[in-house]
């Protein structure tokens, strides 16, 4: 029987690089992934016409993250909310059992506004849009430990609620003019997948 091999020695540069990579992997940890901390409440807002890929993909990633973290408790608690208890998705599937838009959101939390079909997002007079926009104005995500995350054209709802004032933002490649109309004092960054402000 041979002795177990010693782990390879790492140079100071390799060690620093490994720490940086480990730190990058834990980027969301700044708000709830530390051991013993509160889980992050993640509110996916799903009005009519929501693109399933825009919320199901991120929700699955967070669910998977919960399974990979220590078993004590999840880092993310997922909530699916909307003005109505059921919402017709982008592909015609009805998403039911949605919770109402909460009256308050306490930190740590994320509010995720997802993209929608072009027909759903273009109606300025839409009742559901007005309810979501009024709700966003009340709960003011993006402040006091409640992060605002917009996916694709979900940025248009945040812009309509006035949440992008003097912010650096992006949206779906087909919507920069609409974003500029709704948030004229925001800095819209075109042709970007991410804009962090």
Q: Where do the model's predicted regions map?
A:
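Conserved anion/nucleotide-ligand pocket segment
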Residues: 196-197
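Phosphate- and divalent-cation-binding pockets in alpha/beta enzyme and binding domains
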Residues: 156-157, 178
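Extended, subdomain-level signal for the structured scaffold at the beginning of enzyme domains
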Residues: 1-148, 157-160, 190
């Amino acid at each position: 029987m041979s002795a177990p091999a010693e782990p390879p020695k790492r140079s100071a540069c390799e060690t620093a690089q490994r720490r940086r990579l480990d730190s990058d992997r834990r980027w969301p940890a700044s708000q709830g992934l530390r051991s013993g901390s509160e889980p992050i409440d993640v509110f996916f807002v799903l009005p009519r016409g929501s693109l399933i890929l825009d919320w199901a993909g991120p929700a699955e990633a967070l669910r998977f993250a919960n399974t990979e973290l220590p078993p004590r408790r999840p880092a993310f608690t997922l909530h699916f909310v909307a003005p109505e208890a059921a919402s017709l998705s982008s592909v015609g599937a009805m998403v039911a059992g949605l919770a109402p838009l909460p009256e308050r959101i306490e930190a740590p939390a994320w509010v995720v506004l997802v993209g929608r079909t072009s027909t759903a997002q273009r109606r300025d007079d839409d009742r559901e849009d007005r309810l979501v926009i009024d709700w966003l104005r009340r709960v003011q995500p993006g402040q006091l430990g409640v992060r605002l995350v917009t996916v694709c054209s979900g940025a248009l709802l945040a812009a309509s609620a006035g949440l992008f004032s003097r912010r650096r933002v992006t949206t779906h490649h087909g919507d920069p003019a609409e974003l500029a109309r709704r948030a004229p004092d925001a800095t819209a960054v075109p042709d970007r997948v991410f804009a962090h402000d």
